[in-house]
A protein has these predicted regions:
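Conserved N-terminal glycine-rich FAD pyrophosphate-binding loop of Rossmann-like flavoproteins
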Residues: 37-70, 74, 242-246, 255-256
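An anion/pyrophosphate-binding glycine-rich loop and adjacent beta-alpha core
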Residues: 39, 227, 233-340, 346, ...
Length: 529
């Protein structure tokens, strides 16, 4: 089957839905959103903390938020991107509220603001401790009520279509690579359909599932980054993987591991060893409120030093009723496994959480491939640099959805559908009846990345990861050519591509910076004398 849409959106989180709503109301053409699972199962739903925006101008200002972001990014953030997100944030917050998103307010009607690690002021808007789910709910309601958006749930994008599929030779040096749409797997027919578009927008979210333990759902397999890389697009900063310092330690729950939000440390939570001894004073003067990379490395070091599988977060000294009010979901979750957080320590450990790199884009969300935009976690805007400041990601997605929508609405009439695109060819392939080949390889990718490309790295570990991934790549590509396409096989292929990109860029960065810490190059390159 061949479908034609002026705007084709791959992904359904805050970035994809915000963009869809903005272009739909412009009435510049047909809009389609491809959802890998159901519309409500995006990575956005798992974000607990909140949305960073300067709203209390009595004590806060844009310069402070910009400075906090630059410091957290270890001074390699793109200043223009930082300024754009920070200054546009308040207006985008208003739009979220107009779409039906609720943020907690104080009795005087002002927003109830949290403060999180790395922020110099209280500026985190939130909805209790499930802000992501509330944003997803509000946007999802608006999208479902919009008759101009076609939603294709449980459909899987296999590849983006470029002139390569028309027989042209495309390399990373090819100027003006064009995107003509995507090949998409239909779950009902198990056939790959052709979706032609004038504009394609990648909003596929993160890639935490390439690690053994992650706060991301199992669907976060780096599909967007992998598809664009294979299409010879530019991908950047993939070595900067953020590990959330405090995922709930509960063996068996790894995809996703339950997130203990940063706001709990902003609220006054103290990191301790199981024996009650605090340890952050040894690592940073900001103690438990230090940026995530510092806290994650500190926890990792203490766990290795003492042979522990977790450390603890302590909020037992806080008012029990306040704790329950601010963190109802965390309280309920911990209680369900026998932990009363008002009386007991919370067992926590780091887990893969956020990809700061991704598909390289400009201030309008344009990638290096013509007619292809990338938004949200799968993109690399330059905002995060070497490390993401807490709660900057949801607002980044909304801001770039706005700039990309304006840019694509302005230019969509310049493009035509490419009618010469061939149908997906799977002649001569077999139905794969040995799923164990896929499930075992997925497990191997997770073990390889966690053991060798984790919080602390070395040349030796990275070389071992490279070799293991190379072998998995050869095996999986051979399987891909031999059998019919399946979602599971495509995800494995994408995970291997993303694992390779993280490893390669980690090898190439001969310094420690931000989230990338290697024992062979423990300082910044410019610190060496």
């Amino acid at each position: 089957m061949v479908y034609k849409y002026d705007f084709l959106i791959i992904g359904s989180g805050v970035a994809g839905m915000s963009y869809a709503l903005k272009v739909a109301r412009a009435h510049k053409g047909k809009v389609c959103m491809i959802c890998k699972t159901s519309l409500d199962e995006a990575n956005t739903s798992f974000a607990q903390g909140g949305v960073a925006s300067v709203t209390n101008l009595e004590v806060d200002n844009f310069d402070k938020h910009i400075q906090d972001t630059m410091i957290a990014g270890d001074y390699i953030s793109d200043y223009k991107a930082v300024k754009q997100v920070v200054t546009m944030a308040p207006e985008q917050i208003k739009e979220l509220v107009e779409w039906g998103v609720n943020f907690d307010k104080q009795q005087d009607g002002k927003f109830d603001l949290h403060r999180e690690g790395g922020h110099s002021e209280f500026r985190i808007l939130h909805h209790a401790d499930d802000t992501g789910a509330e944003i997803q709910r509000g946007l999802m309601e608006a999208v479902r009520n919009c008759p101009d958006i076609d939603i294709k749930e449980n459909h899987f994008a296999v590849e983006i279509i470029t002139q390569h599929h028309l027989g042209a030779r495309v390399t990373r040096r090819t100027p003006y690579i064009n995107c003509y749409g995507a090949y998409v797997l239909n779950p009902e027919t198990q056939k790959v359909d052709t979706y032609l578009s004038k504009v394609t927008v990648m909003c596929t979210g993160g890639c935490g599932a390439v690690y053994q333990t992650t706060t991301n759902p199992v669907i976060a397999t780096g599909d967007g980054e992998a598809m664009v890389y294979r299409a010879k697009g530019t991908v950047a900063d993939m070595e900067f993987v953020q590990f959330h310092p405090t995922a709930l330690y509960h063996p068996g729950e790894t995809h996703p591991a339950f997130l203990i939000t940063e706001a709990m440390r902003g609220y006054g939570g103290i990191l301790r060893l199981p024996n009650g001894e605090s340890f952050m004073e040894k690592y940073d003067k900001r103690l438990s409120l230090a940026p995530r990379d510092i806290v994650a490395r500190a926890i990792d070091k203490e766990m290795k030093k003492h042979g522990l599988d977790h450390v603890c977060l302590d909020v037992t000294h806080k008012n029990p009723e306040e704790t329950k009010h601010h963190f109802p979901n965390i309280y309920a979750k911990c209680l369900s496994i026998g932990i009363d957080i008002t009386k007991d320590y919370i067992p926590v450990r780091p887990a893969a959480h956020y990809m700061c790199g991704g598909i390289k884009v400009d201030l309008n969300g344009c990638s290096s491939i013509n007619r292809l935009y990338a938004l949200g976690e799968c993109s690399c805007t330059g905002l995060h640099g070497g490390n993401r400041l807490a709660s900057n990601s949801l607002i980044e997605a909304v801001v770039y959805a706005d700039t990309a929508a304006k840019h694509s609405i302005e230019h969509v009439d310049e493009y035509d559908f490419n009618e010469k695109v061939p149908a997906w060819n799977d002649e001569g392939t077999l139905t794969n009846e040995e799923k164990v080949l896929i499930t075992q390889s997925v497990k191997e990718v997770g073990e390889c990345m966690s053991n060798y490309v984790g919080i602390v790295r070395s040349d030796l570990r990275l070389k071992r990861a490279w070799d293991r991934l190379d072998l998995l790549y050869e095996e999986t590509e051979n399987l891909f050519k031999r059998v019919k396409v399946s979602k599971e096989l495509c995800e494995l292929r994408n995970m291997i591509n993303v694992g390779y990109l993280i490893t390669r860029m980690a090898i190439e960065r001969k310094e420690s910076r931000g989230l990338h810490y290697t024992i062979d190059y423990p300082v910044h390159a410019y610190d060496k004398k």
